[in-house]
Each structure stands twice: as structure tokens, then as C-alpha cells.
């Protein structure tokens, strides 16, 4: 089987206001691969994610994400890179005054979708993928935390991304719900979307083993 590299970082250093967070980071992720980014809170996992979606610049090294050269990336092109990425955070960031359907529609309109029939069809499709058929008319406060996280995953899948970046997506969920969400991410990767999954949850990691990068003492190593 031919492998397609979807994320490639070489000798990258990442700085935040506090100074250098990660040094000499080299990693590659293939199309459809599931990879853990494991590390304690504050170890630099989020900085790696932010570098990949071009929120934090590289201080040195080179990087290519979904065909975009991070070093040469112009500000005006960042939204085009991000359309190839789906980003899922620990906090759900749903609009509390809008239904699940309207939350997803809002994102679609913001990223250039105009055909209302296509919008409805696509939303129905992603809600089915994440196991939320029939929940489109519900308000966020009417569904559980696990279901809210499924909505954020549906939101991340809207534009058929090549990569999902999941930053502590199970941090606010109980163990059983976390396991369900993890199975969903694994299904997403099996369908051809790369998943980089940042977590400090060793229980989850031990239950669902996969290729692992560890963030510790300012470096990222494969374990």
C-alpha cells in the first residue's frame, strides 16, 4: 500500500511568550494514520497542535501540512490550510443559543457553503457518522457532554478534512464516554482521515494502543 505523508515536520523549534517550548521536533503522519501525542498538562502538546494549524510559527526547521509549506505560508492562505484540518478541543465551544443543526450550518456558511440543500444533506451525513441521527433540532444544553463532543467532531468533519487534530478531546468526559469517543476517532482514521490525538489520559492510551509520540522536557520522541 502506498503511504502519503500528510504532516511532515523536520527539526522544528516552537516558541511561545514563555520561551522555547519544543526543540528539534521531527515527525511524520501518514494519510489515515492514528497517532497519539502523549504528555502531561503543560508539556507542549497544544503548542505542537498550534504549530500544525499555523497559529504558532516555527522558530526553525521546516514543515509541510496537507500540502502547505508552513515556512512559506502567507497569512491570507492560513484559512485554506485550516479547511483541510478539523480541530477538536476539550471544551466544546458550541453556540448555546443555536440548535445542533444551526451550529453546524453556521460553520458551513462561514467557510463558503451557500447551497441550502447541500448544507442540509451534508449535516445529515456528518450527524449520522457521529451517531447523532435525529438530534439536529436539539439545543446543546439538551444533550449530554459526550453528545456535545460528538457535535464538535461532526463540525470538524464538515469540510472533509485530511487531518483531525484532537487536543484533549476526552478531558471533560467520563471513562465510558471517552471510550466511545475514542472508537469514533479510530473509525475516522480507518476511513482515510489522519488523526493526531493529544492526551494525558493513560487509561485511554492503554485501552486503545496506537503509534505514540511523547512530549516531555521540551522534546517529542517516538515510543
Question: Predicted segments — roles?
Answer:
Residues 61-69:
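Conserved ABC transporter NBD signature motif
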Residues 98-106:
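Short coil-to-helix segment of the ABC ATPase nucleotide-binding domain corresponding to the Q-loop/switch region
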Residues 70-86, 188-190:
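ABC ATPase NBD coupling module
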Residues 53:
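Helix-to-loop junction immediately C-terminal to a conserved catalytic motif
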Residues 138-141, 159, 191:
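Conserved signature/switch motifs of ABC ATPase nucleotide-binding domains
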Residues 139-143, 147-149:
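Conserved ABC ATPase signature
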Residues 164-167:
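Catalytic Walker B motif of ABC-type/P-loop ATPase nucleotide-binding domains
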Amino acid at each position: 500500500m502506498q503511504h502519503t505523508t500528510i504532516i511532515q515536520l523536520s527539526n522544528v523549534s516552537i516558541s511561545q511568550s514563555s520561551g522555547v517550548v519544543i526543540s528539534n521536533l521531527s515527525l511524520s503522519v501518514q494519510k489515515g494514520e492514528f497517532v497519539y501525542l502523549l504528555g502531561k498538562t503543560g508539556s507542549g502538546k497544544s503548542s505542537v497542535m498550534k504549530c500544525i494549524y499555523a497559529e504558532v510559527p516555527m522558530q526553525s526547521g521546516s514543515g509541510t501540512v496537507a500540502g502547505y509549506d508552513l515556512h512559506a505560508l502567507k497569512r491570507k492562505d492560513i484559512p485554506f490550510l485550516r479547511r483541510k484540518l478539523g480541530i477538536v478541543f476539550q471544551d466544546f465551544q458550541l453556540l448555546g443559543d443555536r440548535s445542533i443543526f444551526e451550529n453546524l450550518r453556521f460553520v458551513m456558511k462561514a467557510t463558503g457553503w451557500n447551497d441550502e440543500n447541500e448544507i442540509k444533506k451534508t449535516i445529515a451525513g456528518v450527524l449520522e457518522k457521529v451517531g447523532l441521527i435525529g438530534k439536529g433540532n436539539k439545543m446543546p444544553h439538551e444533550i449530554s457532554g459526550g453528545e456535545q463532543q460528538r457535535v464538535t467532531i461532526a463540525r470538524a468533519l464538515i469540510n472533509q478534512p485530511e487531518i483531525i487534530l484532537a487536543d484533549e478531546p476526552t478531558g471533560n468526559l467520563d471513562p465510558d464516554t471517552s471510550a466511545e469517543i475514542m472508537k469514533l476517532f479510530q473509525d475516522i482514521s480507518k476511513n482515510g482521515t489522519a488523526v493526531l490525538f493529544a492526551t494525558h489520559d493513560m487509561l485511554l492510551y492503554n485501552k486503545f494502543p496506537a503509534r505514540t509520540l511523547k512530549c516531555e522536557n521540551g522534546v517529542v520522541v517516538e515510543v
